[in-house]
């Protein structure tokens, strides 16, 4: 049996992971990360609930204080991208640098052979000795999109015990069976450091000024005024405050000129994208190849052609044009249920662009 550290967020998923591994006879250590100063230290917080579950299971529990690192690596990056008119996904960066970076280092320092998390994803090892990341049995909860940037070195040191569990109801049933205090606790919010998922309020609290500017039609006409580019996202329709013969959508966020560009629905469709900072879990099969990709978490994989470019970039051409390709989000490539790799969406491409 192994000495395994479990990333315990105080939620149902990671608590069940700890209980399952203990049931299997492993020596389990609980680690809870404190990433930002909580509003309280009582019930419902990761530190409290993680420690409570660890005490129930009779396992050691460690609180890892990472507030300065999380601020520097994740929150400041998030704010900077919004300043540039992009729509970031901080969870992907957090997984690579924090959970499977600093937390994994702490697990090794505590003598753990492996780090286990409550992610819904599967990791297998192929005949070639390479680790493969695959979608979870529970497709509705699959989190493989968020882990595309993990390296082989990271994947060799982690396990995902919930990857084969078919439903969240089954996880909750296990939590109840283990008598865990968090068995009925709700799922966590989308971005952990943004209170009430109010992005605009958070960004303004962090120093981004709500600078009004023009809302411009793709044809060039000034149609109205916006209340700050950080308050808008690609594909947004509601809240524009514009009367027009057809529904209008946000097509572009130009923070350098303080403009929001809008247009009719057909202008949201893009033929492809340019990806940057591309990384691969397994080597790409060729410099140009067909596969499928997701351009946001809840997007269904769509057929595409990938062309590798210099400087860890790539061009992606969709078989059918896709709606709301958003700079700052991520494109992740799949071959059937296997994650190949991915990268940050740098720009959307129309059919006329090279």
UniProtKB/Swiss-Prot annotation:
The keyword rRNA processing appears for this protein: no
A single GO cellular-component term on record: cytoplasm
Region (Interaction with tRNA): 141-143, 296-297
BP GO annotations: tRNA wobble position uridine thiolation
Positions contributing to ATP binding: 7-14, 33, 118
Family annotation (SUPFAM superfamilies): Adenine nucleotide alpha hydrolases-like
One GO MF term attached to the UniProt entry: tRNA binding
Cell membrane listed as a keyword: no
Keyword list, A-Z: ATP-binding, Cytoplasm, Disulfide bond, Nucleotide-binding, RNA-binding, Transferase, tRNA processing, tRNA-binding
Reaction catalysis annotation: S-sulfanyl-L-cysteinyl-[protein] + uridine(34) in tRNA + AH2 + ATP = 2-thiouridine(34) in tRNA + L-cysteinyl-[protein] + A + AMP + diphosphate + H(+)
UniProt xrefs under InterPro entries: MnmA-like, MnmA-like_C, MnmA-like_central, MnmA-like_central_sf, Rossmann-like_a/b/a_fold
Localization: Cytoplasm
Catalytic residue positions: 94, 192
Gene3D superfamilies: Adenine nucleotide alpha hydrolases-like domains, HUPs, Translation factors
UniProt-listed Enzyme Commission number(s): 2.8.1.13
Similarity comment: Belongs to the MnmA/TRMU family.
Main function: Catalyzes the 2-thiolation of uridine at the wobble position (U34) of tRNA, leading to the formation of s(2)U34.
Annotated protein name in UniProt: tRNA-specific 2-thiouridylase MnmA
Source organism (scientific name): Trichlorobacter lovleyi (strain ATCC BAA-1151 / DSM 17278 / SZ)
Name of the encoding gene: mnmA
């Amino acid at each position: 049996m192994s000495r395994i550290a479990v990333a315990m967020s105080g939620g149902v998923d990671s608590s069940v992971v700890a209980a399952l591994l203990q049931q299997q006879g492993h020596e389990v250590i609980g680690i809870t990360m404190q990433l930002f100063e909580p509003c309280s230290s009582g019930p419902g917080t990761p530190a409290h609930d993680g420690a409570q579950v660890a005490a129930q299971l009779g396992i050691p529990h460690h609180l890892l204080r990472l507030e300065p690192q999380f601020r520097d690596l994740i929150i400041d990056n998030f704010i900077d991208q919004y300043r540039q008119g992009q729509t970031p996904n901080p969870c992907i960066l957090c997984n690579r640098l924090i959970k499977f970076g600093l937390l994994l280092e702490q697990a090794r320092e505590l003598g753990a052979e492996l780090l286990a998390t409550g992610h819904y994803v599967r990791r297998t090892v192929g005949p070639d000795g390479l680790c493969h990341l695959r979608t979870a049995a529970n497709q509705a909860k699959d989190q493989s999109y968020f882990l595309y940037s993990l390296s082989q070195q990271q994947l060799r040191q982690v396990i995902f015990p919930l990857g084969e569990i078919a439903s969240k109801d089954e996880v909750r049933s296990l939590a109840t069976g283990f008598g865990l205090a968090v068995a009925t606790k709700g799922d966590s919010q989308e971005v952990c450091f943004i209170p009430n998922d109010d992005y605009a309020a958070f960004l303004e609290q962090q120093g981004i000024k709500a600078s009004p500017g023009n809302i411009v039609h793709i044809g060039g006409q000034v149609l109205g005024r916006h209340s700050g580019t950080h308050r808008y996202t690609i594909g947004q329709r509601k809240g524009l405050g514009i009367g027009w013969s057809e529904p209008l959508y946000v097509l572009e966020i130009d923070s350098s000129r303080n403009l929001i560009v809008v247009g009719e629905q057909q202008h949201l469709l893009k033929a492809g994208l340019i990806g940057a900072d591309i990384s691969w879990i397994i080597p790409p099969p060729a410099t140009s190849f067909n596969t499928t990709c997701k351009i946001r978490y809840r997007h269904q994989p769509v057929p595409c052609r990938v062309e590798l470019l210099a400087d860890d970039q790539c061009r992606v051409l969709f078989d059918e044009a896709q709606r709301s390709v958003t700079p700052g989000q991520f494109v992740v490539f799949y071959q059937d249920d296997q994650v190949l790799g991915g990268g940050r969406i740098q720009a959307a491409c129309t059919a006329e662009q090279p």
